[in-house]
Amino acid sequence: MYAFLDMTISHVTSLLSLFFSFMNMRYAFAYGADAVYAGQPRYSLRVRNNAFDHDNLKIGISEAHALGKKFYVVVNIQPHNSKLKNFIRDLTPVVAMQPDALIMSDPGLIMMVREHFPEVSIHLSVQANAVNWATVKFWKSMGLTRVILSRELSMDEIEEIKQNVPDMEIEVFVHGALCMAYSGRCLLSGYMNKRDANQGACTNACRWDYKIHEAAEDDTGDVIPVTQLEKSTCCQNKDADEQHAIQQHQFGEPVLLQRNEEEQFAAEEDEHGTYFMNSKDLRA
């Protein structure tokens, strides 16, 4: 389950939760969630997990409103031209259900909603990667009522954004996935196994169990393993020897990440992050 803090202009904090079924939604409300959200069929990055068709969306929205809660519909896919053809037709019955807002990331889809449904409230999705107050101010000028900030921000940065755009609602993740690249625009799933996270098929490769191998470049420039540095997962306690070995790795030196005997992936790390260098990266 994911959770968010919604820091509104009234300084009231509310809790939001992602869900995939009526049971999830009812548990979320029973345990104090103020709002929930679910993806629109065909236009959400949660299409593999989403049990909500249009009929279920309508029931979910009605149940939420009957409890005095809010229900947001996520429309955050990165659309190709083919997805634009029927977008307004498919969205019209969803708008008629009166969700409290649409969560969106693509400027083109946002423009289309603004043109056809100017009364609908739009929240900027984390997929749009808002990381500074100028970006937040821009989206406010476009008529959006809330911005979901990228996970990469510190508390000080979030506070600075709120100070510079005090009348914009701010939403932040307090629990959830760790994306490769900026929040939501993940290349790792497609890189690892050709399942595109930006089209709703994320395999959560960021949560797999990896081994780390020291590596070096050979005469042809290929990265080859030297020795294994670490065997534990990110979520296990490491003993002193393992910690020492990891500390010996220097920024800028290549490593190999291994999931199983057949798969090894070259990576480099510096003070700014971790990099996977491969021609597959261009597919995004």
Show the residue positions of the predicted features.
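N-terminal low-complexity segments that are often proline-rich with Ser/Thr-Pro
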Residues: Y2-V12
